[in-house]
């Protein structure tokens, strides 16, 4: 049906042969016999298919007459579910009601208006066959022929990530496959290997742009210190009038460097790619452990980053795309394997080596604490030296040489400048906040390890791993929000 000739029908069959085909599980209570004929059982199966398609697509294509309908699994209900996450008779009303009042980047529908070959099959009032437009939940513009700006930006971010992966493909291949470090991991099902591969790309790119951002910060604050020093010499020391030109040259260099960093979007890419990598890490280990979402047919991380900027929806879209696939068959001794996940993801705080997130967060916390102590010590040192210099000037007053007095005055200007620059640099990197976050995450993983040690069976272990993953995703969302509030700036210069 739907084809005007055998040639079109054959073309469709050839196209269908290129697709990956997999079966969704039967809805609870359904059998193959009960869905063989039209009826409530088959409608529930269609509703499940609708939920799966909606949960794993970036843009829902709806060939629809625009008329509302209460038929379960029908196009009208699929569109409604995609925009509200509510499907009467299937999803609980309160569980997803918050989708109705939040910016939800997965609500976009592209409708092609069509009629039905039956009496009364014309499109809804005001619509004509073959019209096409985007449907959104925006009450001010529910229909638009142009892709809304927020979604355009979101898809642009996806394209930029794909371009970066292609650009650095050779280096990515040479990077360490952190999720596939042993023979057991390489025996995992293909879908999990695909997630590990995407993680490898996102992790490499995040580290690549992190180096650029941190280099940019160090250079910027070094320039700020040098500019301050140049101005002090220009203003307070005779014979250094040319320092004003040094000041301007340093400022110009910093401005050019800042313009390059902003144009190439270094910080945004570093933050986005790091959060994508950490989301994929959770997704990978959940699947290896056999942890499924509470409604396994839906996308497991549908709330990840939902409270942040809609622009960040591209991260969830990437995770959504790589999660598409059939339910994997168990591989004895390999998959599902909660024990493997506990060892590789969580790790052991008492074991040697660097395996697991417990050891990672401990190392990061110790490193940030040392940096914080250095910043505090520098501030105190500068304070006391400044007080000492002030006392010397006050006590000796006119009894010291003019050249010595000039040096002391310069020192009084340089010391607080150095302390201020170091403090600003630490604030920009959010060192204090990260110490607290790393301490929290380290305790979180240690507590999870303790709970897993007394779990009675794999089901209890999966419950703990699910809770741990959800908490980790929440913390990653807080991390990106914290750093987005500290953008690269030229104002310090």
Model regions and ranges:
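Generic intrinsically disordered, low-complexity segments enriched for polar/acidic and small residues
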Residues: 9, 19, 43, 130-131, ...
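Extended low-complexity acidic/polar segments
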Residues: 123-143
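Conserved non-transmembrane functional hotspots
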Residues: 136-493
